[in-house]
Amino acid sequence: MRTHFCGLVDETLIGQTVTLAGWTDVARNQGGVCFIDLRDHEGIVQVTVEVDNAEVFAVAASLGYEDVLQVEGVVRARHAVNDKMRTGKVEVIATAITVLNKAAPLPFHAHENPGEETRLKYRYLDLRRPEMQRMQRTRIKLVQALRRHLDEKGFQDIETPILTKATPEGARDFLVPARMHPGEFYALPQSPQLFKQILMVAGFDRYYQIARCFRDEALRADRQLEFTQLDMEFAFVRERDVQDFVEDMIRAIFKEVVDVQLDASFPRMTWAEAMRRYGSDKPDLRIALELVDVAELVKDSEFPVFTGPANDAEGRVAALRIPGGASLSRKQIDEYAAHAAKYGAKGLAYIKIADNGEISSPIQKFFSEASFAALVAHVGAGNGDIVFFGAGGYNKVSDFMGALRLKAGKDFGLVADGWAPLWVTDFPMFEWDEEEQRYVALHHPFTAPAVDDIADLRANARTAVSRGYDMVLNGNEIGGGSIRIHRPDMQSAVFELLGIGAEEARAKFGFLLDALNYGAPPHGGIAFGIDRIAALMAGTESIRDVIPFPKTTGAQDLMTDAPSPIVDAQLAEVHIQVRPKTN
């Protein structure tokens, strides 16, 4: 139906007859001549229809937005070059136009940017927009480049099951009723974690998969119910073996897909250092602001909000200096306090130093002149700055001060251009869940501890460090991995520390424990979020822009109207009865 793509018609084709097919982007009838911007996935070319070709002119004059056309014509140099178009030096003089399909009146035009609900309801129209085409192509190029790179490095692309066993990995499972086994259910995989470990036991050595994963969790801009990850696993490796390989891979992929040259060597930072300096386990290093601990300077003050945490081994008092922040009004300071409150802050103390050196602070009265001056000097504050203070439990203070750091960086234009990758390592093995009164795994239950001795792990569970690692880019965790537990006795001990008894462990993970018993090699791996990397490459804040058919934050597919009710007959086949929802 066509000989060339619209967006690839150029000067080399001048004088030649071409057949094109695409959509009417714009049609303009200027009396003696009609101009049609014909669009396909490669771009737009101008089609010109002259009035002396009456039959073709009549067709052109009747066209509407998004009508589907086949155009035959001769390529000619344009009198008025359009430098904004790739095809702007040529036009196609139409000799025949066939309308392949008329488009109904549109809910929005390809050049408009309607609300997200409208875009998702008519996703097929939204995806026609050039910007959406660009972002989807970025994703396609990313996946192609990853596959090519891993195939060349000897990795084996192995599929793992979609219908599998429900196992706890931190989020709620999507359950699928098993019709042939009444009352029993499959679960959709949250990740291929256990299968890829078993593939290492099976001797496949280097595995990868572009895997679909499912987690029934609350949605936001960087979360979806179903998502795609590059899953990788290596046998007989230590942390640096995995990190060095994937660092080289990510560097090569960014260069190939978006022509970005990442650092020759990614910096490394322990989890403890990241939390201390940046209040985040995925710090955005493009923002130069850092948290400063001030407990030693405030522990003897008369301000109880500070003295309590400052004299508590598990407390923290931290400061954040914002250059130029003295320009903040009282209302704006209150907005910062409200932002911190979302992350657990109960208040936000501050010191504001005007350009003339005048100090405004609600906490100054609780300090002697000398101790207050020492505090200001310690945080490096000068004229024109504001300093925010957070006090409380160590982790909570780190969280809300880290959130303030990000907000201040954006508000004050302190986010540097470019790319800032790093490795975050040495994560805590466990964290204490106050609600459940037990330890939970910070990464997942299959991450190896840094110690090999089970007695040591049991005795020091609270401070145990894992062999986990995350790759962070511009404040986004793009990949997370670890060295895995390969000894069955260590895996059983970790289950025990997590409050998973022997009977429960056998019921949920018996197949894994059995596999580890039959000669499991030391192994480790990593998983990268394809959606998130594609969004970063495409320059969009929301992963929904790089997913062809995403769900809304309300967990709905507006185009297909999913989820939707199921008729009783279908429910009966899978032995399910829906009970009315009660408040």
From Swiss-Prot:
Can you tell me which residues bind L-aspartate? 169, 215, 443, 484
Q: InterPro entries attached here?
A: Aa-tRNA-synt_II, aa-tRNA-synth_II, aa-tRNA-synth_II/BPL/LPL, Asp-tRNA-ligase_1, Asp-tRNA-ligase_1_N, Asp/Asn-tRNA-synth_IIb, AspRS_core, GAD-like_sf
Q: Which Enzyme Commission number(s) are on file for it?
A: 6.1.1.12
Name the predominant localization.
cytoplasm
Q: What class of enzyme is it?
A: ligase
- SUPFAM superfamilies referenced in this protein's UniProt entry, alphabetically: Class II aaRS and biotin synthetases, GAD domain-like, Nucleic acid-binding proteins
Q: What keywords appear on the UniProt entry?
A: Aminoacyl-tRNA synthetase, ATP-binding, Cytoplasm, Ligase, Nucleotide-binding, Protein biosynthesis
Q: Where in the cell is it found?
A: Cytoplasm
GO CC, sorted alphabetically, is:
cytoplasm
Instruction: Give the molecular function GO annotations.
Output: aspartate-tRNA ligase activity; ATP binding; nucleic acid binding
One GO BP annotation is: aspartyl-tRNA aminoacylation
The segments labelled Aspartate in the record are 193-196
Q: What does this protein do?
A: Catalyzes the attachment of L-aspartate to tRNA(Asp) in a two-step reaction: L-aspartate is first activated by ATP to form Asp-AMP and then transferred to the acceptor end of tRNA(Asp).
What is known about its subunit structure?
Answer: Homodimer.
- Write down what this protein is called: Aspartate--tRNA ligase
The gene name reads aspS
